[in-house]
Amino acid sequence: MIYNILIDGLCNIKKLTAARELFNSLPLKGLQPNIWTYTIMIRGLCKEGLIDEACDLLEKMDGNGCSPNDRTYNTLIQGLLQWNETSKAIEFVKIMVGKGFLANASTASMLIDLLSADPGDKVLKELLQ
């Protein structure tokens, strides 16, 4: 989808408002964002520190009949961890694992770093097993 490339490019050059407008215009053009479109927007929002909006978008995604996949969850979790939103990240790891998905190498590495900072965290230990 050409719109995915455009939205990704806009996010990469920090034109998030334009990316958001293009994303929101898709249904008006008779197009539905797909899993990659959502993941691209979530990554763009996370890069700019708009964590709550990224979390909301993932929830809207699921509500719009486009179920997140492991890449979508890993993208959001990595964004949360980069902005020190550890408790939210753990919540989404639990949801991701509950849906049968696994953390990718980068997410697992970030979780291991968290565990090394707090070796007594039972939740993190459980998630990494």
What would you call each of these model-derived segments?
Residues A117-L127:
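Alpha-helical linker/edge segments of TPR/alpha-solenoid repeat scaffolds
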Residues L22, L57, F92, E126-L127:
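Alpha-helical solenoid repeat scaffolds, predominantly canonical TPR units
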Residues L80-G100:
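C-terminal structured "cap/appendage" subdomains that terminate the fold
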Residues Y3-N4, D8, A19, N24, ...:
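Pentatricopeptide repeat
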